[in-house]
A protein has these predicted regions:
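Acyl-donor-binding surface of acyltransferase catalytic domains
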Residues: 1-11, 79-86, 92-164, 304
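Conserved donor-binding loop and adjoining core beta-sheet/short helix segment
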Residues: 18-23, 33-112, 119-124, 224-238
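Glycine-rich acetyl-CoA-binding "A-motif" of GNAT/NAT acetyltransferases
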Residues: 68-73, 141, 221-226, 285, ...
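Hydrophobic adenine-recognition pocket in adenosine-nucleotide-binding enzymes
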Residues: 91, 244-246, 279
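Active-site/acyl-donor-binding loops of N-acyltransferases
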Residues: 136-155, 261-307
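Phosphate-binding active sites in nucleotide-utilizing proteins
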Residues: 186-220, 224-235, 248
Length: 307
């Protein structure tokens, strides 16, 4: 367990801040997150946080523990994001409306220089999160939309630009080229553009990874021009447009639409009936593309930022 930087004890709970979780604490966080997801219909911790629970050396962890030893609240702080520190927090559904979310948020705010614009995610955009943000003088900053569509019925045939062919990702062969293309395609994206080989390999190691659903588009010389990485969620089963990117030099030729359709057809052929994706509300071009392909708004995740 990492060193305890702060401890505030009240009559019923203890808030601890540390730089590392042991395996038992990681299991408690995952159990807490699962309970919240079942109640809220939205995962409170994104994939990169779940992966980083055991490995993120620079992360800070705030845990809220009852006298019984049950973890009833958790917050994750990543101080390394180039756009500024970013955090997540979750309180167990049976322990809400008791001020625990406020205590975790106060701990997060106290862990970051007041001059730095800390951002905190609210997954599902619930009114209670908006009220908590207002109480702590945080303003609405970024909106990440979740869009969904049914996969029933025929999907249009993808039409690739002349000379472009599509194939599946080959682990160990395409890694470096994909990382370079991803960085170029998402140069202005606050999270995706930061991925390197460690982030790619961490996801290749996940049980859900399937190279057959990781589609690459390349020119006649074998240079990667775009990709559509799909992911299949279980319980309930839904296919995701996990990451879709196109080389900026290849924009305007319909490659993004073709890759999207190819991935959706792959998911439909795998027997899935629904598809989902995440897109920034401010990315109007992408929102238009997905809307034209039949996607509709399902939910939203929001960041709140310190003024």
């Amino acid at each position: 367990v990492g060193h305890v930087a702060e401890r505030v004890t009240q009559t019923t709970t203890t808030v601890e801040q540390s730089d590392r979780l042991d395996s038992a604490q990681v299991d408690q966080v995952l159990k807490l997150a699962a309970a919240a997801a079942d109640t809220d219909g939205a995962d409170p911790l994104p994939e990169q946080v779940v992966i980083g629970l055991r490995d993120a050396a620079s992360a800070r962890h705030l845990t809220l523990t009852a006298p019984t030893g049950e973890m009833i609240g958790y917050a994750y702080l990543d101080p390394t994001d180039p756009a500024g520190p970013v955090a997540e927090l979750v309180v167990h559904p049976t322990h809400r409306r008791r001020g625990y979310g406020g205590r975790l948020l106060t701990g997060l705010l106290g862990a970051v220089d007041p001059a730095v614009p800390l951002r905190v995610w609210a997954h599902g955009d619930h009114p209670s999160a908006a009220a908590l943000a207002l109480d702590h003088d945080l303003v609405r900053d970024r909106v990440l939309l979740q869009l969904r569509r049914k996969l029933a019925g025929p999907l249009p045939e993808p039409i690739l630009p002349a000379g472009v062919r599509m194939r599946s990702f080959v682990p160990g062969q395409d890694d470096a080229a994909w990382v370079a293309l991803n960085a170029k395609a998402f140069a202005d994206h606050p999270e995706q553009g930061r991925w390197g080989l460690p982030q790619l390999h961490a996801r290749i190691a996940q049980p859900w990874f399937d190279p057959a659903g990781f589609l690459l588009a390349e020119d006649p010389a074998g240079r990667l021009l775009g990709f559509h990485w799909t992911k299949v969620h279980t319980g309930p089963a839904v296919g995701e447009v996990y990451v879709l990117g196109v080389d900026p030099d290849a924009h305007g030729g319909g490659l993004g639409r073709a890759l999207t359709l190819a991935g959706l057809r792959h998911l439909a052929a795998a027997g899935l009936h629904r598809a989902m994706l995440y897109v920034d509300e401010s990315n109007t071009a992408a929102v238009r593309l997905y809307t034209r392909l039949g996607f509709l708004r399902w939910s939203a995740d929001v960041t709140y930022r310190r003024r």
